[in-house]
Amino acid sequence: INVYAPKDLLNLINAHNEISEKIYNFDLNFNALNFQKSNKLYDDNILEIFSFPVNHSVPCCGFLFKEKKSQRNIIKTKIKDLGLGIGDIKKLKNRENCLVNGKAIKYKDVTVPGNKARSYAYCADTKYDKKIIPFIKDVDVIYHESTFLEELKNKASKTKHSTANQAAEIALSANSKMLILGHFSARYDNIEKFVQEASSIFKNTVAAYDGFKYQIKN
């Protein structure tokens, strides 16, 4: 199992294991988060995950999830028409031209674009800070904390949290397509006020709730 957390957590895990004489039947790979700069946490054929520093009263990170550019889709009728083999298809889908029976085949002539790569940024807990924008520029969806409404802007600054308006400003500056608000203070009964406030700056805004799910379209 891979664990990503502040470095001091490893001391706690080790102390717990020593006291309890715990022996895992799996490998535990501990990865200390970097609170000073962006860091790649995960990378496979489909997805990349990055952490980036945010501005809070204790060291804290945001996270960026980015799908990699997908393979192109082969036009099925071309397989039989051109006598394409499995190896040829693989090359063409990966944007490589190939030679089939002495004939040059361009990938653009026999494939169509695949699904659009999607992206999602999670920004919490954090004070309003435009320094995060380069890390999340052009992201599809941003989740940004909005602990307070604008009437408590000063309190938000002191406690290093954000208002709904400030979350909207981040989404607008980052050129995001959608903003999800969350981390609301318990003092508020009407969460819709957060959406109303943020929507005056960034129209495509919704509020998260327990069990909230959102499908990012390709």
Predicted feature residues:
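Active-site HxH/HxHxD metal-binding segment of metal-dependent hydrolases
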Residues: 1-33
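General small-molecule cofactor/ligand-binding pocket signal
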Residues: 4, 29-34, 50-52, 206-208
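Hydrophobic side chains in beta-strands
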Residues: 5, 65-67, 216
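Short "lid" loop at the C-terminus of a central beta-strand within the Rossmann-like core
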Residues: 8-9, 55, 148-149
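A short helix-to-beta-strand connector/capping loop
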Residues: 24-29, 44-45, 117-118, 201-204
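Binuclear metal-ion centers of metallo-dependent hydrolases, dominated by the metallo-beta-lactamase
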Residues: 33-38, 129-218
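Active-site-proximal loop/helix segment associated with metal-binding centers of metalloenzymes
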Residues: 42, 47-122, 126-135, 141-143
